[in-house]
Amino acid sequence: MSALVIALPSKGRLKEQTEAWLQDSGLRLEIDGGARGYSANLKGLPGVEVRLLSASDIATALDAGDVHLGVTGEDVIRERGGDVDARVMLLRALGFGRADLVVAAPQSWIDVDSMADVEDVAHLYLARTGQRLRVATKYGVQTRAFFSRQGVVDYRIVDSAGATEGAPAAGVAELIVDITTTGATLAANNLKIVPDGVILRSEAQLAASLTAAWPDETLIAARRLMRIVEGRGRAKGLSSLRWPAEFDGPARRATKSFLDHGAVRRSDGLLVPAHDMFDAAEALADAGVGPVSVDRPDYVFEASSPVIEALAARLGQGKASETASASA
């Protein structure tokens, strides 16, 4: 059997958040060789090989087809350049590892409030000094693409090997493009975010390689994983209401309107979006239905996984998707 190879972060906050997400989904990461190992398996999910890599190495491995799935920031995936969407498919945003890729200018540039202003400054700088405005960044691919879309041409990239936010103060650049979460570090270095200079609002993504080899059994394992994480994610937004069987008629009439807002009938009750739970309970009480119990489900599984079906279609493996549906 061909194993499903998943790359996960090997260190830092992203590693901790990824492990917490897996554990919340009922999957425990077991690292081979102790805490310093670089391979692992997922307890409860056979047929899966886990590789622990840096965030940037995960993006590289996905792009090259060395792994099937990976968890890393969208910012490092996008930095692979070219038509990356033809090589890597984003399956699920994970809700952590959030950061913005932004253009930041010195706070002393009080008249710079837009990328159009940046272009004006760059043009004047070139006319005055004969040199292009220097932009320090580790994200050259996305910077060039964004500046092109914004019509900024009179600049040059300075590759940043260290703390990018210190480049203007050090005299090695006039502007920077960097990742920020709160903007506090930029402010501490007397920099401001250009209001329309947000290049990407990034977060951790579960992504799939479109260049890897995907035999049917590998797609089946991926479908099993997605069923688990989707089932857990779906359950977090739902509440389950149950009532005595003898009240089923009036209960169904009382909750009919909720079906138009994401509620789903069950043989013994109703699944409703969590934010509608109190309204649904009140509607049942007004109809004389009771007692009504409310639970939060651990998982809510659907008959199919649209994400894996979309992946199979991108891979040209519609038949593999059918095989997975029959076998999982």
Identify the function of each model-found stretch.
Residues 58, 68-72:
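Conserved, well-structured functional cores that handle cations and Mg-NTP chemistry
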Residues 59-60, 168:
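Short alpha-helical basic/polar micro-motif
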Residues 103:
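Periplasmic solute-binding protein
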Residues 123-124:
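Short, hydrophobic/aliphatic alpha-helical segments
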Residues 51-56, 63:
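N-terminal low-complexity or amphipathic/hydrophobic leaders
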Residues 2-47, 52, 71-100, 109-119, ...:
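Small-molecule-sensing regulatory modules
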Residues 64-66, 172:
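Alpha-helix C-terminal capping/helix-to-coil transition sites in glycosyltransferase folds
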